[in-house]
Regions:
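N-terminal core-entry segment
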Residues: 1-168
Length: 168
């Protein structure tokens, strides 16, 4: 992405269907890695204690069933993102800025969990677009060199995708 008019470029990208199966192939690998991280992390008490504020309910061994006990998009996104990052080793994207595309998983999943009338391809498309936005931004500018935290790109990518989903 060029540095000019990023808002328009992101809007146009989100409004355009993905044309290449390469997008989905890469996203599939990242999704599988993310699922593995979430499932393994959920077996550790210290992760669950950190990820879930409300300790009044008993946790299921399947972390995706625990999502149903959370009260908001934010709680679902936080829970899944903490579980993802606890064991997230394999999806580091190296460019001018490093990134972990799987950091977008929690926010995108929270939308589709609350809106189950979509198909899995809609979920993978949204997640792939978040990955692409974050990766494209990382190719252009190193935030760390400017004194900012690289997770801003996650916030921007996840926020853009989530906002576009809300308009559907």
């Amino acid at each position: 992405m060029q540095n000019k008019n990023l808002d328009k470029q992101i809007f146009n990208f989100l409004s355009t269907p993905l044309k290449s199966d390469d997008h989905f192939t890469s996203a599939k690998l990242a999704i599988l890695d993310t699922l593995g991280c979430i499932i393994e992390a959920s077996t550790h008490d210290e992760v669950n204690n950190f990820a879930i504020e409300d300790k009044s309910f008993e946790l299921f061994s399947n972390p995706f069933l625990n999502v149903g006990k959370l009260n908001s998009y934010q709680e679902v996104a936080w829970y899944l993102t903490v579980l993802t990052r606890w064991f997230d080793y394999n999806d580091t994207f190296l460019a001018k800025e490093w990134a972990h595309p799987s950091d977008n998983f929690g926010s995108v999943y929270s939308y589709f969990y609350a809106n189950p009338n979509f198909k899995f391809i809609d979920f993978t498309t949204a997640l792939t677009k978040a990955y692409e936005i974050q990766g494209s931004l990382c190719l252009g500018t190193s935030l760390n060199q400017l004194g900012y935290d690289h997770v801003f790109y996650v916030k921007l990518a996840s926020g853009a995708v989530f906002s576009s989903l809300l308009s559907k």
